């Protein structure tokens, strides 16, 4: 979200669900834009989610899925000669993703979900710019009018409908893409971000800190070994523990434990644990 500055953004619209209050509080505190929050009460897919924002979108729109961290030049949206942009990243394990198939000029022709053969290695990362928003709504209407696929309607099907009606969507490759959609990839992404400069080290008497780490103010640690690749939020207390490659939320209590590859939420209490969590 920090990368949208300078793009002439007039409003941020968040489609929320689980932990909506946490999202709202964070967004209001973090971003200096007007924010609107819409709860998706029926989990009917990405097309259904974006359709909830329709009454409030009257011009070009940037759509960002929240389970990914990316490095991309979003200023391309201001100059591109196209009806939209779909950002993608070349991957070797293309079988795990929806991939973007393009023509010779780099414009999307279709998206293939989890192909068994390498029709493309450009993974769809969930970052889009749509200039022709009316064509987007027409595509979503078409998708929502058809039977749902296992209860969900997909935004990429709306893009396919746009292409079939002669709209041009450019596939642009990102410099970096870090997935946060599963515990393992979230921990991996956390380590990458720490190594790239997000680290924040604090030292404590009798505690060994192995960089990179991110430790907020208000954390207390005693007789422990922390890091590498550990993030700890404010209010957490740790004692007599060894913690590596782990993310810990606010106000947690951890004692006499060895943790590696763990995700601990806010106010979690752990004692005598060995392993991941």
PLM region descriptions:
Residues 34-36, 107, 168-170:
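Conserved beta-strand segments of alpha/beta enzyme cores
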Residues 1-65, 74-76, 267, 271-275:
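Conserved N-terminal catalytic core of the sugar/cofactor nucleotidyltransferase
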Residues 67, 90, 182:
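Active-site glycine-centered loops adjacent to acidic/histidine catalytic or metal-binding residues
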Residues 70-145:
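Conserved core of the sugar-phosphate nucleotidyltransferase
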Residues 13-17, 88, 247, 263:
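Short internal beta-strands
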Residues 13-14, 63, 84-87, 171:
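Structural beta-sheet core signal
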């Amino acid at each position: 979200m920090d990368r949208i500055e300078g793009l002439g953004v007039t409003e941020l619209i968040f489609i929320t669900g689980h932990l909506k209050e946490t999202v709202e509080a964070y967004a209001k505190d973090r971003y200096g834009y007007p924010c609107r929050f819409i709860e998706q009460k029926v989990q009917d897919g990405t097309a259904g989610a974006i359709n909830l924002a329709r009454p409030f979108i009257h011009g070009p729109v940037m759509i960002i899925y929240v389970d990914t961290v990316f490095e991309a030049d979003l200023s391309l949206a201001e100059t591109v000669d196209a009806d939209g942009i779909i950002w993608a990243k070349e991957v070797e394990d293309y079988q795990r993703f929806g991939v973007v198939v393009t023509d010779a000029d780099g414009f999307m022709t279709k998206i293939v979900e989890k192909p068994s053969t390498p029709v493309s290695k450009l993974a769809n990362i969930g970052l889009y710019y749509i200039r022709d928003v009316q064509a987007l709504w027409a595509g979503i209407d078409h998708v929502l009018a058809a039977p749902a696929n296992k209860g969900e309607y997909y935004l990429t099907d709306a893009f396919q409908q746009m292409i079939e009606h002669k709209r041009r969507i450019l596939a642009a490759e990102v410099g970096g893409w870090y997935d946060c959609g599963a515990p393992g990839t979230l921990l991996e992404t956390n380590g990458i971000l720490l190594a790239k400069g997000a680290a924040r080290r604090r030292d404590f008497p009798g505690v060994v800190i192995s960089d990179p780490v991110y430790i907020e103010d208000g954390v207390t640690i005693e007789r422990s070994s922390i890091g590498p690749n550990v993030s700890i939020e404010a209010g957490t207390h740790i004692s007599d523990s060894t913690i590596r490659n782990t993310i810990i939320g606010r106000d947690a209590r951890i004692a006499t434990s060895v943790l590696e590859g763990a995700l601990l939420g806010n106010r979690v209490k752990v004692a005598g644990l060995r392993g991941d969590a």
